[in-house]
């Protein structure tokens, strides 16, 4: 990734985070933009969103984000319009890395419990 694309990705991430904080409904889930990857020609910004909360609420928030894609792009464009000739189109993806890490930790914990011998009680007479 070139320095220009990294700077653009950081700018989009920072500004979209502020937009999400103001625009997304407060529904008991924590929504965070964990990363933005932008194509070399700056035409597409892939935005990775982490949603902490129940699966149902996460799906609902992600559906809302997808539905309001054009609205978020318009708000973002109004904030950073002087820095681009053409605003990149936004693609939102749910980042489930936190869930995957929790699942792997659970598997490791179960494997450790299964492999460790259970202590036998001492017979005291």
Curated annotation (Swiss-Prot):
GO biological process: maturation of SSU-rRNA
Top-level taxonomic group: Bacteria
Keywords: Cytoplasm, Ribosome biogenesis
InterPro entries xrefs: KH_dom-like_a/b (IPR015946), RbfA (IPR000238), RbfA_dom_sf (IPR023799)
GO CC list: cytosol
GO MF entries: ribosomal small subunit binding
Localization: Cytoplasm
Gene3D superfamilies: 3.30.300.20
Subunit record text: Monomer. Binds 30S ribosomal subunits, but not 50S ribosomal subunits or 70S ribosomes.
Protein family (similarity comment): Belongs to the RbfA family.
HAMAP family: RbfA
Function per UniProt: One of several proteins that assist in the late maturation steps of the functional core of the 30S ribosomal subunit. Associates with free 30S ribosomal subunits (but not with 30S subunits that are part of 70S ribosomes or polysomes). Required for efficient processing of 16S rRNA. May interact with the 5'-terminal helix region of 16S rRNA.
UniProt-recorded name of the protein: Ribosome-binding factor A
Organism expressing this protein natively: Chloroherpeton thalassium (strain ATCC 35110 / GB-78)
Gene encoding the protein: rbfA
């Amino acid at each position: 990734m070139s320095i220009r694309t990294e700077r653009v990705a950081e700018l989009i991430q920072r500004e979209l985070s502020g937009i999400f904080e103001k625009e997304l409904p407060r529904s008991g889930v924590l929504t965070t933009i964990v990363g933005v990857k932008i194509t070399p020609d700056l035409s597409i910004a892939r935005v990775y969103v982490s949603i902490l909360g129940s699966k149902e609420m996460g799906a609902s928030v992600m559906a809302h984000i997808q539905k309001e894609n054009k609205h978020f792009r318009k708000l973002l464009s109004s904030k950073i319009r002087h820095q681009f000739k053409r605003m990149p189109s936004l693609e939102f993806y749910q980042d489930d890395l936190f869930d995957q890490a929790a699942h792997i930790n659970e598997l490791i914990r179960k494997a450790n419990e299964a492999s460790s011998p259970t202590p036998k009680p001492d017979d005291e007479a």
